[in-house]
Each structure stands twice: as structure tokens, then as C-alpha cells.
Amino acid sequence: MLQIVIPAFNEERRLPRTLRELRRHVAAHRGELGRVEVLVVDNASADATADVARAADSSALPVRVVHCARRGKGAAVRAGLLASDADVVAFMDADGATGLAALETAVQRLRLGADVVIGSRGLDDSVTEARHCRSRSAGAAAYRRLARRLTPGIVDTQCGFKVFRGELVRAAVQDLRTAGFSFDVELLVRLRVAGARIEEIPVTWVDVPGSTFVPARHGAGAFAELARIAWSTRGLAPDPGRVAASGTRSPMPLPAAAALPAAVAVPVVVSLALRSPR
């Protein structure tokens, strides 16, 4: 069985279309995917997110609502993963930005021996359509540079499409501390420490309007989270031999930034990013 976790904060407008497309896709690819259930994690939404999720429940695609009172995408994904019980568990964003054809590819990779399969917008065969302004694109580039220092060998940590062996990821998220948008980085670090074989696959990705990530509001916090992750996972020993990804980077920890309070860590982290080579 495959369970798909969808974190949702005030997603009453975008979620119905995503669930409709997912239901059609699952019906057309039942042979490759098998039985599928969706876990929509209502992240303390102020709108009708939970209601539209329940309305989408059907025999063709069962939809279950999981409630998460702690705000933050990382907290919501963690709650959904812990509520799962399937052999294969995925999470994807509520906006449906990643093409669903990646599901069959990911499931097949798991059958061939991968433990974790993540969508990557940075691979040569990926097709992306972004509408970011220059300032957001520059911030994203700096963030990627830093994230790669914590997850060497992984090209794109932040794509909202990841598929896991259920037992492995449920164990990994037990100690997950990052509640915000940088949770992917901590999760990947912990999975590597657990010896997981991580593979990246190319995806089709479209920037869907209405993102809940607002750079002015969340950008500094995301950088500070990276510093906290570097600090909280210090001393852990990942197994780089188990990572299969396109492109490699040498690990370079950030002890100076990680040891500082968040208010000070952010400018230090940004400074390190600007000084580091591509």
C-alpha cells in the first residue's frame, strides 16, 4: 500500500484540484501503484481545508484528515508520516506543483533497492517553470548552497515530492525538530545517518500561484533553521556511500553559525553562502 501525506495550511482553494488530479492519476496507474490512500494534514487552518479534504474521500481514492495543531510545514509532514502505517509513504505539496508521473518512477526505484526517492528540479532531465522574482531566486540559490553543505551529494533538498520506505521514515522523524520549511534538510540528514540509500529523480515542476511561503516572512527563519540543524545534528556520522544522486559536494559544516542564536546566525549563514564557491 502507498500512503501520500499532503500538508495543508489554508489550502481550501488549491487542494480540491490536486486531489481530483491525484484520483484520476491513481485510477489510470493502479497496476504500478497498487492501493493508495491520502493523508491530508490540516495544519491548524483557518479556512475549510479539512472540509474539502473530507469531501474528496471516495472508494477510488480514500482521503483521511490528520490534525496538526503545531504550525509549520515540517510539523505537519511529521504528523502525517507518524500517522501512516503503509510500507511505502510519500509526501507531496498541496499545490500539486510536481508532475504525478514521478510517483510510478519513485515506486519502481524503491522496488529496485532505493530506500528514499526524492524529486529534484536540478537534474538535467527535469522540466521546471518558475515565476520567482530576482530577489527570491537569489535567496533560493544561497539557501541551496548551504543546504548542500549539510546534505552533500543531493542536488535539490526542497522539492515537495519525496517517497520513502515507511518503517525507515517513521523511525527517522521521531526525533525531527525542525517545524518550518527547512525540515527536509534535517530529515535527509537523519535518513543518511540511518544508512538510507537516497536517489534523486527528475521531475516536471510548475510554480503554482498561492504559495504559503512568503520570503519576507519566512526567509530569515529558513536560514536560521539551517543553522540549528547543523548544530543539532553535529557529531552524527552519515554514510555517503549510500547516497545516489546527480552531482556531489564535499560536506562543510557550519559550526560558527550553528552555535549562535537565531538572530545572529542568519547574517552569518548568509555571509558564508555569499563567500562559498558554486
Which residue stretches match the model-derived regions?
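Conserved donor nucleotide-binding strand/loop of the catalytic core
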Residues: 32-33, 37-39, 50-83
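Acceptor/aglycone-binding surface of glycosyltransferases and processive sugar-polymer synthases
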Residues: 68-83, 88, 100-181, 208-217
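Hydrophobic helical membrane-anchoring modules
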Residues: 1, 175-278
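A conserved acidic beta->alpha catalytic loop
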Residues: 42-50, 96
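Short, well-formed alpha-helical segments that are part of the catalytic scaffolds
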Residues: 11-27
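Hydrophobic targeting segments
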Residues: 1-6, 15, 22, 36-41, ...
